[in-house]
């Protein structure tokens, strides 16, 4: 059985756990370094990226997670998780886990009040998926080697080797396409 870690600090932790269970995988809440042991993949949920970044540094999780990513462990960042993984945050430097060759802009769609839901066609799935954007970032540039999986004017889902990033919250929908893609296609 595959074991998928979910960083349990902020965001839709419980919602991610439920999606993982629906797919027959075992969720593992990650709050400390020891929780990273024996994971097959890791999800970095949304929340506030600066606060999550401080948590990763203070707990020592940052270096451990980076090592696992460099070793090839699949990782998926949703919303703030995508910001954490970005090599370049527009006008702000890089994310705490700078492994994804994109430029991302924080809160690009506005405040909490500007949150929205949209159906977006995903060629890889050959279906439209529901996407929920809450204070979402916008991917403004992708480097060579980064595959754009879905777009809404600009990329909203990208894949670079073992790194998946979505600027929206798939865990808040009734669908399970993105979790299925991560668990069944990326996690070995």
From Swiss-Prot:
Biological process terms in GO annotation: glutamine catabolic process; pyridoxal phosphate biosynthetic process; pyridoxine metabolic process
InterPro entries attached to this UniProt entry: Class_I_gatase-like, PdxT/SNO, PdxT/SNO_CS
NCBIfam families xref list: PLP_synth_Pdx2
Gene this protein is translated from: pdxT
Organism: Caldicellulosiruptor bescii (strain ATCC BAA-1888 / DSM 6725 / KCTC 15123 / Z-1320) (Anaerocellum thermophilum)
Family: Belongs to the glutaminase PdxT/SNO family.
HAMAP family according to UniProt: PdxT
Protein role: Catalyzes the hydrolysis of glutamine to glutamate and ammonia as part of the biosynthesis of pyridoxal 5'-phosphate. The resulting ammonia molecule is channeled to the active site of PdxS.
Pathway field: Cofactor biosynthesis; pyridoxal 5'-phosphate biosynthesis
Listed EC numbers: 4.3.3.6, 3.5.1.2
A Gene Ontology term for the protein's cellular component: glutaminase complex
Catalytic function, reaction form: aldehydo-D-ribose 5-phosphate + D-glyceraldehyde 3-phosphate + L-glutamine = pyridoxal 5'-phosphate + L-glutamate + phosphate + 3 H2O + H(+); L-glutamine + H2O = L-glutamate + NH4(+)
Binding site for L-glutamine: 47-49, 106, 134-135
Pfam families attached to this UniProt entry: SNO (PF01174)
Quaternary structure, from the entry: In the presence of PdxS, forms a dodecamer of heterodimers. Only shows activity in the heterodimer.
Gene Ontology MF terms: glutaminase activity; pyridoxal 5'-phosphate synthase (glutamine hydrolysing) activity
Keywords: Glutamine amidotransferase, Hydrolase, Lyase, Pyridoxal phosphate
CDD domains the UniProt entry points to: GATase1_PB (cd01749)
Protein name per Swiss-Prot or TrEMBL: Pyridoxal 5'-phosphate synthase subunit PdxT
Keyword Manganese carried by entry: no
Enzyme active site: 79, 169, 171
Top-level taxon of the source organism: Bacteria
Classification via Gene3D superfamilies: 3.40.50.880
């Amino acid at each position: 059985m595959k074991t998928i870690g979910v960083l349990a600090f902020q965001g839709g932790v419980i919602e991610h756990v439920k999606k993982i269970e629906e797919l027959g995988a075992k969720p593992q809440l990650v709050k400390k370094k020891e929780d990273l042991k024996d994971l097959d993949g890791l999800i970095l949920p949304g929340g506030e990226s600066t606060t999550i970044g401080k948590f990763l540094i203070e707990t020592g999780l940052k270096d451990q997670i980076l090592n696992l990513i460099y070793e090839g462990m699949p990782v998926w960042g949703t919303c703030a998780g995508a910001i954490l993984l970005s090599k370049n945050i527009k006008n702000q430097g890089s994310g705490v886990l700078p492994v994804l060759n994109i430029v991302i802009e924080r809160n690009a769609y506005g405040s909490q009040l500007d949150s929205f839901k949209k159906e977006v066609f995903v060629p890889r799935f050959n279906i439209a998926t529901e996407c929920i954007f809450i204070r979402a970032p916008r991917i403004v540039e992708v480097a060579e080697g980064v595959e754009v999986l879905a777009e809404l004017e600009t990329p909203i889902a990208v894949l670079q080797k073992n790194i998946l990033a979505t600027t929206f919250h798939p865990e808040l929908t009734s669908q399970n396409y993105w979790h299925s893609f991560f668990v069944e296609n990326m996690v070995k």
